[in-house]
């Protein structure tokens, strides 16, 4: 693990959701399902299963179960995995990571299997300081343990870190851990019922850098 002298203007560590904050997995899910409506229904059922399953169950198993539950054929999960290495990167994501690299350690905390999570993380072309998947943590977000594992591996308290979410459900977990959170709400989802309000929210990534560099963003 690399050791980086912290910049006074930034937190020591910035953690990211991967599949919705940095990568456009929506497009691949929708394509595998055959339409946006079918893809959203499939994704919603998958999320329901992950948030209710407790200890980790294989990601691929939950994806298949969700497809069956909403009436999709077995070819849909197969198409999703076939398109995995073509997950689009959101515009501005690589530029943001490059701008942060001199100032912060960077990590990913993702609801995914180890196999697919590390493959997806590699698409950004970043030398990540930590990549934590739900399989490695033993639980799916928003359980606190995946975020806590990433912070522990970087030997950094939550007070000296920040999180960039792609889902409003991350806010439940980051609040418990004490991570300041920017919600990159690219597709305009409603805040989940009962979820804490994020420190900042935008449909774009351009606001992340000034938010992190703002006075008071770094630990005192």
Can you say where each PLM-predicted feature lies in the sequence?
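Tryptophan-centric aromatic hotspots in well-structured domains and transmembrane helices
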Residues: 25-29, 87-90, 128, 183
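Asp-based, Mg2+/Mn2+-dependent phosphohydrolase catalytic module
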Residues: 1-14, 98, 109-220
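Alpha-helix C-terminal capping segments
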Residues: 27-36, 66-71, 97-101, 120-124, ...
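Active-site neighborhood of HAD-like aspartate-dependent phosphohydrolases
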Residues: 2-47, 71-72
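Short, acidic loop-to-helix structural element flanking the phosphoryl-transfer center
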Residues: 59-64, 77-108, 118, 122, ...
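A metal-dependent, Asp-based hydrolase signature
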Residues: 35-36, 40-44, 48-81
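Short glycine/proline-enriched coil/turn segments at helix->beta-strand junctions
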Residues: 34-38, 71-76, 101-104, 125-127, ...
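Alpha-helical elements of Rossmann-like donor-binding domains used by nucleotide-donor carbohydrate transfer enzymes
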Residues: 28-32, 41, 65-66, 79, ...
